[in-house]
Amino acid sequence: MSEPLDLNQLAQKIKQWGLELGFQQVGITDTDLSESEPKLQAWLDKQYHGEMDWMARHGMLRARPHELLPGTLRVISVRMNYLPATSAFAKKIKNPKLGYVSRYALGRDYHKLLRNRLKKLGEMIQQHCVSLNFR
């Protein structure tokens, strides 16, 4: 018989794994985001989502994770800086002969980078808790 899962210990491991994968911050919350839903709707109503039409079509799923993936118990959120501390970016922007491109547009597509790291984090969690799924 296996030991019962210590959820606090698991949360600490998930946060540590996230840091090891290069995320600057990892947060874990439950799925009741009802307090945030009116703020999200107001943000969408003001069209702050710009050309991201999928946000208007499916934005409320962000406030209702249980509708996105039935059976969801927790939401894990991560943060990753676009501009590494070791970047020589500050020196480059002082050069009047250079044009500027947003940091997120340089190099590898950050969506792919995040997706790959999140997949690795999900796999690490699944190795530790085989009965859990992730998306």
List each model region and its residues.
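Auxiliary alpha/beta "docking" domains used to position bulky ligands
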Residues: 1-135
